[in-house]
Amino acid sequence: EKVDQQRKEKEKLERLTQTSENYQKNAIVIRSRALQGFVDNIKTRQESLEELAALGIDLEAACYRVAVFDLDLYSDGSQLTAEKRQESALMSFVLFNISDEIISKEKAGVAYQAGNNKVGALFMGNRTREFEQKIMEICRMIQDKLKELMSLDISIGVGSWARTQQELQ
């Protein structure tokens, strides 16, 4: 009976762990969709800000700047096999995690999964030369870390400064 009880406890712990992992994955997807909606002006500014605030994300800033990171390995436009699509999604998730970690640590904005296995970054701050340099430095850090960990290259596109959500590109 004691062995049976231990087995049940172990199964319960495994279910809780799986539930927690599923929740984390879903939270990232929900967060990314909300950020993508803000960047793409899908909802009004107020709707986006309220949705993001409910997720614990504050986007109030003097200026914004968007960057997109694209894995070079998968961006040549050729048809991807199911296996390559899965690999691409996994590498994109690694890129997202690296980006999210660095951008959060630098307190420069937020990262999100932008679809098509791309990762977006919404940089928030004051339009200064120092912040401009910090953004470029962060992009290089992400590029270098991905190269170091996965031996992968990325292309980076950085948009222009925007004072409002409508100006984001």
What are these regions (language model features)?
Residues 2-137, 162-164:
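Interdomain helical linkers/hinges and coiled-coil/dimerization scaffolds
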Residues 110-116, 144-156:
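Catalytic core regions of nucleotide second-messenger enzymes
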Residues 141, 156-163, 169:
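Cyclic nucleotide signaling catalytic output domains
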